[in-house]
Amino acid sequence: MSKINFTALFYIISVFAVHAQKSNFLTPQEKKEGWKLLFSGTDLKGWHAYGAKEPGSAWKIDQDAIKLDVPERAGNKAKNGGDIVIDQIINGDFEFKADWKVTKYANSGIFFFVKEESKYKNMHDTGLELQVTDNTIYEGAKENTHRAGDFFGVANARLREINPVGEWNLVHFVMKKNKLTVSLNGFVVQEHDMAGADWKKRVAESNLKNAPIAKGIYSGLIGLQDWGSTVWYRNVKLRVL
C-alpha cells in the first residue's frame, strides 16, 4: 500500500471513529487541549441572530444537531430564519470543528471573522464563507468558488471529498501564525498564507474587498448561514490557540 493510500485510509478510519462517538461531547484529551463546545446538543445557548437577539424559530434542535428547518424553499431566506452567530468574539489564532449535512440542492455556509456592526447589513458583508452545499447544484457548471469546501468567491477547494446528501461531513478550520488550513472529511482542501500576496489578491478581488479582512484584520464571530434550505450542524467546537 502506498504512503498516500495509507494516509487516506487513516483519515477515513478517523472519520468513522469520530462518528461512532457521542455527539456534542468533549473527550478528556479535547478538554485537556482547551476545546469548548459551541453547541450543547440541547439548545442554542451561546448563539444569537445576526444583528438581533434570539435565533429565529426556523432554527431548531433535531437529531442532536442545530437544524435550519425549511420545509419548502421560497427564496434565499427561511421564514423565521436568518443567519446566526456565536456570542463570543474571537481574537487571534484558533481551531474550529463541526459536522454538517444537507438536503438535496441545499446551500449554506460557515462564516468566520464576522463583524456585527450597524454599518454592516449582512453577515456575508464581512464574513469569510466556507461553503456548505450539495454540489449537484453545480453539476456540469464551469469550475467556480461556490462548492462545498470552497471559500465563496475567494478560493476553490483543491479536492472534492464530499459525502453524499444526507451524510455527515467533518470540517476542521485552523488559523495559526498567518496560516489558514481547512480539512474536509480528513483531507486538506485549503491552505493559504494569509500574509502572502496570493491570498491578499484573492480577497481584494472578492466581495470582501471592503471588509476588515481585506486590511488584515482577522477577528470576529463565527456564523451559520440561512440561505433558504435545510441543513444540520453538530459537534461544533472551538479552541483558542
Model-derived regions: residue spans:
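Carbohydrate-interacting regions of secretory-pathway proteins
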Residues: 21-241
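Bacterial Sec-dependent N-terminal signal peptides
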Residues: 1-23
